[in-house]
Amino acid sequence: MTEQTTSPTLPKPGQPIVFRNGTVVTVDDTRSVLADTDVLIVGQNIEAIGRGLAVPDGTFEIDATGGIVMPGMIDTHRHMWQTAMRGYGADWTLTQYFVWYYLEHGKSFRPEDVYAGNKLSALDALDAGVTTTVDWSHGLRTLEHGEAALDALTSSDGRYVLAYGNIFNGPWE
């Protein structure tokens, strides 16, 4: 028996999108939560929120039944370059973290390692509903490391602020 898979259909650039029948968290002044509600997006704007919305011809429809529709979240403190070492040292003290991440492992990171960590972290954030991130990129040894971090972010969907930091000028010196 062979299993056949199909790629999901994605909206075309500029195509209007409507989320149908979701639980909508509005984050407006009333902090409304609306059940079984549609959200119409045209371009980068939310054009309408309501039940049974009439939409333009050719609108891409997403069935949001059982799901939550809300604006993207903001993460103001993420060390994206460290994603490549996720879970490593999870039981360390803060002192061990500084010594091993910075003085041992962090200093062996190449620009391509920083790129991989930032790219993976960007994808991970988007998968969790985070669309804006401040990257506390304090493990950068050279300009090339900084450029790799920036390249990973600019080639990823989402919004990012790169908070550049140099590993050689840590608080322990």
Predicted features and spans:
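Histidine-rich, glycine-flanked metal-binding segment
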Residues: 2-18, 24-70
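Active-site-proximal flexible loops/turns
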Residues: 28, 70, 82-86, 142, ...
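Residues that scaffold the ATP/ADP-binding catalytic core of kinase and kinase-like folds
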Residues: 27, 49, 83-84, 97
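Short, glycine/charged-enriched secondary-structure capping and boundary segments
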Residues: 33, 88-91, 147-150
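Flexible loop residues that form catalytic
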Residues: 27, 79, 138
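Active-site loop-helix segments enriched in His/Asp/Glu that coordinate
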Residues: 108-173
